[in-house]
Amino acid sequence: MALQQIVEQTVAGLGYDLVEIERSAGGLLRITIDLVWVPPTDEVSAAVGAEQFITVEDCEKVTRQLQFALEVEGVDYTRLEVSSPGIDRLLRNEADFKRFEGEVIDITLKQPMGAAAGGQVHANRKKFRGALERADSGGWQIVWSDEPPVKPGQRISKKRVPAPLQALGFTLDELREARLAPIVDFKGRGTKPGEPG
């Protein structure tokens, strides 16, 4: 049985989602897991499960089970690491894009924009950061503004005209990689978007 298959079966059997498998030099086998996402319904609000994360105990449980499975299958590795996806989680399929719709993501295209850029962005550009949205055509798009972020304490002129939003539509086949943007706010816990506060 192939490594991917062994790990997927073991992780799914324990009730987790396999995000990524990485083999590194020196025999390191790194497995990234996450909780299985269930799309919100009328009965289950989107807020339920939003604060659930992979714990150390989850990683320990998967590690123990994988050690047995990999030994039985004769997979050669020196060290096994099981971890949560972190703040820059890889987005690999349609379900991941649905789950993180509205979040800021970083994408890398397989090919540069070329003539399709139409002078809006540099023709050789392949990397973009923006809010993930569902496109009208049924695909996906990211929306961003090239306006620099406002610094804390900076005064904003009332006459200032905000930079226009730009959008880039794409299909999953056009992506080399997509990840959640690692944006960290060190100011403490604020209110979530959409909450009064």
UniProtKB/Swiss-Prot annotation:
Keywords: Cytoplasm, Ribosome biogenesis
Pfam families: RimP_N (PF02576)
Predominant place of localization: cytoplasm
Compartments, as annotated in UniProt: Cytoplasm
Highest rank taxon of the organism: Bacteria
CDD domains referenced in this protein's UniProt entry, alphabetically: YlxS_C
Disulfide bonds: none
Gene Ontology cellular component terms for the protein in this record: cytosol
One of the GO biological process terms: ribosomal small subunit assembly
UniProt family annotation: Belongs to the RimP family.
NCBIfam families (UniProt xref): PRK00092.2-1, PRK14642.1
Function description: Required for maturation of 30S ribosomal subunits.
Protein name, UniProt field: Ribosome maturation factor RimP
Lineage, uppermost ranks: Bacteria, Pseudomonadati, Pseudomonadota, Betaproteobacteria, Burkholderiales
